[in-house]
Each structure stands twice: as C-alpha cells, then as structure tokens.
Amino acid sequence: QIVDVQGRECSDFQAFSMCALDKGVEREIDPTTTRSLMGSIYPSPGIFSKYWTLDQEALVQIVQDTCGRHDTFGLACTARYYDDLGYPGHINCSDNMNKDLARFNIKPRGGWPAINFFFNTMLDDTNALGMDDPWSRPGDYVMLKALTDLICISTACPCDIDPANGWNPTDIQVRTYNTTENFKKSIGWRKTAEAEMEETKETGFHKSFARYTRNFIEYNGFWLANDMTNIGVVNEYWACREDAAIMDLSPLRKYEVTGPDAKRLMQKCITRDVEKFPIDRNVTTIAIIIPAIPK
C-alpha cells in the first residue's frame, strides 16, 4: 500500500521479478506492455488491473485506488531533467533508485521507466504531454497485490521546480500486509470536489452474480457484472431476444414507495397521473426533488 501522507506527492514505483533476477535477467514492469495488454493508459481495480513485464508476465495487480489519476508515460525524474532546467546536481528519483537497487545487482540507468503514482499528466490538443498539481489528497493510496516474488521500490519524488508535487515535496508511506489479509477491490470517488471519498461497493446481488463471473466493472459507485463466464456476446444477444436476461440495476438508485399514502406521495412528486399506472407492471418516470428552503 503506497500512501500519499499529506497529498499531492508523486511516487515512482517499480517491481522486479525475483525469479528472473536469480537467472541474471532484469525483468521489471514495462509501461508500454502494460498499456497494450490492458487497453488503457494505466490499470485500475477490476478486470484490467495488472502490470506486466516485457515478457508479458504479470507482476502486480492494483486492488484499491482512492486517487484515480496516475502516469505511465514519463520516466522517474532524472539528473538530465534538472540539468536542462538549470538545476544541476538536483536530487532525483532515478539516482535514488539506482543507489537502492545496487545491492540487488540491478544495473543503474540514467532514467528509470516507472509507474508514477499520483502524477497528474495529460495530453493537450497539440499532442503535447503536460502536467499539473496531483489530484491526490492527504491519505490517498493505491493498494497492490504481488502476483509473484518481487523486489519493489517506490520513491517520494523530490521535485520542487514544477507542479509534479504541488511545488512542495512531502512524504510517501509504504505499508506491507501479511498474505492472510484480504482486501476487496475498490475505487475511490467523490460526488463533488468537496465531498468525502466513497469506495466502490458491492450490490446486494453481488454474491449471486459472482457464482457465474469474475468480470465486474465499476459503474456509478458499484461493481456490476460485465458478462457471464463461457456465455459470450452472441448467446447474450439471443437470450435478450428469445429467452431471458438478468441485470443488476442497483446503481440506478431505484426506490420502492409503499404504504397507504404511497399513491398520494408519488402524485406530489411527479406530473404523470398515478391513477393510470398499471398495478402489476413496472413504470419508469422522473421525479424532480426540490429541497425545502427553511423560513
């Protein structure tokens, strides 16, 4: 678990396969392979959650992410970067990584490819790669699961000359947990910029769907089944046409209105004539709720 203690601090992460190192071969996370296999600019909790080596071996899997904004394009910051900007001799992540990895006989590099957690980069209309202050807030974290024996390294980026760390480098905390611990996959999200962070939830039907699939995707704060194992899209199509299909609509936030005054309450909330609603069928309508203003 890589924790941004005070918020807006980048951490350049890399992991090496110990099995490969024992054979004298360096095989670490390769960002390009990862993007190609996952089909996204960086993995996230769910079905497309793994980081891969150049040999297409999965090393780690992201289980939880409360920030949701990272980078896989840039190197860990280098001496050359600071030299070019007029800060020769500035401490940098690549040199720090070289020093710590030397004891494992890992060869030094002028710039390390890395997973730059909490690094806020974007592509503009001219295809230029830019950066801005990180989105991470105090206590935000990513949780990773090792898929094999690894040597891992994670930095607290010392950059203080651009927005990478909000112009103020702070601490990164790394926690490790026993293999007996079990963490549910989740993505942190906020309804508004000022709202408290909420984690992705399982619906009341999750266990029933989990008997038939492991492919769950995040939607509107919930994990929903994306497909059923060994069924396929063609069979799903014909099931919708000729047989039956089941969907979990929990994220739509539907409610049941019951009781002797249910009809009167509904008539106050909507413009449709409730008396014309069929008793034994579902009805879709929209209610606009306006909060009362205290006098």
PLM features: residue spans?
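Glycine/proline-enriched, intrinsically flexible loops and inter-domain linkers
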Residues: T180-K295
